[in-house]
Amino acid sequence: MPELPEVEVVRRGLEEHLSDGVIHDVDVRHPRAVRAQPGGAAELVALLDGARIQSIERRGKYMWLVLNNGRALFVHLGMSGQMLIHEASDPALPTTHVRISARVDVGEKDLVLSFVDQRTFGQWQVTPVVADPHGGFTGVPVPVAHIAPDPFEAVFDPAVVARRLRAKKTDVKRAILDQTLVSGIGNIYADEALWAAGVAPSRRTRGMRQRDAVAVLEQAGAVMRRALAQGGTSFDSLYVNVNGASGYFARSLNAYGRAGKPCPRCGEPIVRVQWTNRSSHFCPQCQSS
């Protein structure tokens, strides 16, 4: 699943091309793409037709388009979702795995927004907007209301979140993947943040020093900012920005995906272990447990 930097790259692309655009001619081509919409495809089409895009926002891995009808188009990219933008006259309009398409008029431009999703885990949902319980936004879509602020937000306080983290009875990697504690961090950036902070993923949160917990959270933000500057992390063709280009932060990873290779800090081979239904990558020498 795309993590914060990858979703932010997409959000910025949508903001650049679609801000103040008017949506029409919405075509839902796969029912799973609107499975959370109470009234299905017909309702989503009716709520989007003629709506103007006021802004494009993001919290953690979740993105939404603020509409002028008091609602928001919530976009979940799932494992393989892509939001691709083309001129309506472009002969290279995508045709494979397009689950939803929409025309968007932006000034004199006639654009097509295609939601391409090979694995069909992603979705669109037009939803009411509710007050943000964390105060970062004027309002958030209903599916985002329970999601915690991410490290890029002004309302995110590493010291406060660190205290909550230390109150949990779990391991630190599981804690920072909890989207109700801190959002936006997935498996890749969890491994990278823990490596950067010198903390083993198995370290128990109870008994953790405050400064170590803060360091993990601060490093998560720092790592994701570096990833954002490089367009995110792409291991295959499924993650791309709105123009179809891939990010290249994979070349800068220190732990994730580097099993058996020397730790950039101490030279000890990076270890890969099974962790729940995923993998953890860490240095057994310089990440303390």
Curated annotation (Swiss-Prot):
Instruction: Show the catalytic activity.
Output: Hydrolysis of DNA containing ring-opened 7-methylguanine residues, releasing 2,6-diamino-4-hydroxy-5-(N-methyl)formamidopyrimidine; 2'-deoxyribonucleotide-(2'-deoxyribose 5'-phosphate)-2'-deoxyribonucleotide-DNA = a 3'-end 2'-deoxyribonucleotide-(2,3-dehydro-2,3-deoxyribose 5'-phosphate)-DNA + a 5'-end 5'-phospho-2'-deoxyribonucleoside-DNA + H(+)
Q: Any one Gene Ontology biological process term?
A: base-excision repair
Q: Which GO terms describe its molecular function?
A: 8-oxo-7,8-dihydroguanine DNA N-glycosylase activity; class I DNA-(apurinic or apyrimidinic site) endonuclease activity; damaged DNA binding; zinc ion binding
Q: Which cofactor does it need?
A: Zn(2+)
Record keywords, A-Z: DNA damage, DNA repair, DNA-binding, Glycosidase, Hydrolase, Lyase, Metal-binding, Multifunctional enzyme, Zinc, Zinc-finger
Under Enzyme Commission nomenclature, its number is 3.2.2.23, 4.2.99.18
Q: Which PANTHER family match?
A: FORMAMIDOPYRIMIDINE-DNA GLYCOSYLASE
> In which family does this protein belong, per the annotation?
Belongs to the FPG family.
Q: What does this protein do?
A: Involved in base excision repair of DNA damaged by oxidation or by mutagenic agents. Acts as a DNA glycosylase that recognizes and removes damaged bases. Has a preference for oxidized purines, such as 7,8-dihydro-8-oxoguanine (8-oxoG). Has AP (apurinic/apyrimidinic) lyase activity and introduces nicks in the DNA strand. Cleaves the DNA backbone by beta-delta elimination to generate a single-strand break at the site of the removed base with both 3'- and 5'-phosphates.
Q: How does it assemble?
A: Monomer.
Name of the protein described by the UniProt record:
Formamidopyrimidine-DNA glycosylase
Q: Which organism is it from?
A: Corynebacterium urealyticum (strain ATCC 43042 / DSM 7109)
- Phylogenetic placement of the source organism: Bacteria, Bacillati, Actinomycetota, Actinomycetes, Mycobacteriales
Gene name, per UniProt, is mutM
